[in-house]
C-alpha cells in the first residue's frame, strides 16, 4: 500500500474507488495499491 498525495491509475486493471471518504486505487497487481494521505 502506497500513501500518496495524488493517486493515479498505473495500469488498465487499476480502479479508483472511494472508501470511508478516502480515495483509493485497487488492482490485481498488489504493487499498485494506493491510498490518498
UniProtKB/Swiss-Prot annotation:
The keyword Ribonucleoprotein applies. GO terms for cellular component: chloroplast; ribonucleoprotein complex; ribosome. GO terms for molecular function: structural constituent of ribosome. Its main location: plastid. GO terms for biological process: translation. It is found in: Plastid, Chloroplast. It comes from the Eukaryota. InterPro entries: Ribosomal_bL36, Ribosomal_bL36_sp. The keyword Glycosyltransferase does not apply. Keywords: Chloroplast, Plastid, Ribonucleoprotein, Ribosomal protein. Belongs to the bacterial ribosomal protein bL36 family. PANTHER family: 50S RIBOSOMAL PROTEIN L36, CHLOROPLASTIC (PTHR42888), LARGE RIBOSOMAL SUBUNIT PROTEIN BL36C (PTHR42888:SF1). NCBIfam families: rpmJ_bact. HAMAP family: Ribosomal_bL36. This is Large ribosomal subunit protein bL36c. It comes from Phaeodactylum tricornutum (strain CCAP 1055/1).
Amino acid at each position: 500500500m502506497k500513501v500518496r498525495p495524488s493517486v493515479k491509475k498505473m495500469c488498465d486493471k487499476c480502479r479508483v474507488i472511494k472508501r470511508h471518504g478516502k480515495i483509493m486505487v485497487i488492482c490485481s497487481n498488489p504493487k499498485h495499491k494506493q491510498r490518498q494521505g
